[in-house]
């Protein structure tokens, strides 16, 4: 959503992506995907996401990086919150646990606040998802304008990520139609 907001008025014309699936393929997903989108004015932006990080990775769940490069500016987003680091001789809990998996060793370094939705503290939920939920609720109750993605934004972005997956699967650049709905 944010990448498209920052490039308002520009339309994606193609995507080229590569994926690897050496670890998580047994669960039907990719370890990591890297994609480069080209916009109608030549601007390019890259996005990579990796779910198969080492079990001792200090971030909670994944690594996400987004870069937008243009002649008028550059933005580089690294979304693992490496600015708040805890290092301890006492092992920290897993960054993410599920009912079926528990990592075999503790993590001694932790990127605090790196869980995407936020953190639980004192029985309360804090972080980006709390703020987004509260402002969304305010929008519903009061009609106040908020900076949330629209359903159309979400649909377009879903189709763009699907095109990214298709590019990785077919190992070729995917030229995007004017109407994203025409691709799927």
Task: Report the location of each language-model feature.
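Amphipathic alpha-helical segments that form well-ordered structural scaffolds
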Residues: 2-6, 135, 160
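Short, well-structured active-site flanking segments
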Residues: 13-14, 171-174
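Rossmann-like dinucleotide-binding domain that binds NAD(P)(H)
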Residues: 1-63, 152, 183-184
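C-terminal glycine/acidic-rich active-site capping loop/insertion
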Residues: 34, 39-41, 57, 63-152, ...
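Short arginine-rich
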Residues: 160-170
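C-terminal interaction segments
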Residues: 155-158
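Conserved catalytic core of Hanks-type protein kinase domains
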Residues: 6, 139, 167
